[in-house]
Amino acid sequence: MKSVYGPVSSWRLGRSLGIDPVCSERKICSFDCVYCQLGHGIKTDKRQEFVSLEKLKEDLKLIAGAGADVITFSGTGEPTLAKNLGAMIEHVKTVSSLPVAILTNSSLFSDVDVHRALSRLDIVVAKLDAPNPSVFSAINRPYEGIRFEKYLEGIKNFRKSYTGKFALQMMFIDINRDYAGEMAEIARVLEPDEIQINTPLRPCAVKPLSRAEIERIKEFFSAFRNVLSVYDAEKPEVKPIDIEEVRKRKRPEP
């Protein structure tokens, strides 16, 4: 399994070349979100090295010339669980002039090393699906010991010091659709550069909300300058280097 895949067509980031710092046949994550397209996996908050820096360097050589707008750390689990994430980010930024992003569930922002590593990125897309502990537990099903209050405080502290583009992704399903107003209030405190309103259109265990429902939710975020919706955003055409690597991450195919 290669640590690099794509490019894939991202409604948020454009043509995205993926780097998977976990690179596991089975999902490894600090959450077990009810809407995850990867299904159940290994739930942990322990950071470790999954992919060596040398392997990443070799895999990057195989995709030279891949047409992409951005390089994104995302894949078969929570990317911040990779203990050598900082070294990976540093290497990618030395070999490419493309902006470098991450899709994170925000669970490890309180970790000093994670905070430092993510500060080097051009774009951080942080997950926030809940306004309170009960909804947090119901949707994200976090690893034991991850408490909502600390989770939210970690996002706030990171946002205060981060100078790149900070996007807040909110996945709406039946469980949290009536909490959009409360989540908008939290977003006002966090002051993201962008709000991404999502619902699970990929095959998973829960049904997506309709376009009309998402439009109603968007109204709560009308005060924000930059709000994207999964139903409205355009997706560019892409040609993955290796379609099988895309399939392993259960990403949509072109």
Q: Which residue stretches match the model-derived regions?
A:
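Flexible, glycine- and charge-enriched loops at secondary-structure boundaries
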Residues: 46-53, 144-148, 207-214
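Conserved alpha-helical substructure of the radical SAM core
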Residues: 39-73
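Alpha-helical elements of Rossmann-like donor-binding domains used by nucleotide-donor carbohydrate transfer enzymes
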Residues: 55-58, 87, 182, 216
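Short, basic/glycine-rich phosphate-binding loops at helix/coil junctions
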Residues: 35-41, 67-70, 130-135, 165
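Auxiliary Fe-S-binding modules of radical SAM enzymes
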Residues: 1-12, 176-254
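Short, conserved beta-strand segments within well-ordered enzyme catalytic domains
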Residues: 18-20, 37, 70-74, 101-103
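Canonical Radical SAM [4Fe-4S] cluster-binding loop centered on the CxxxCxxC motif
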Residues: 12-53
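Conserved AdoMet/S-adenosylmethionine-binding subsite of the radical SAM
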Residues: 80-209
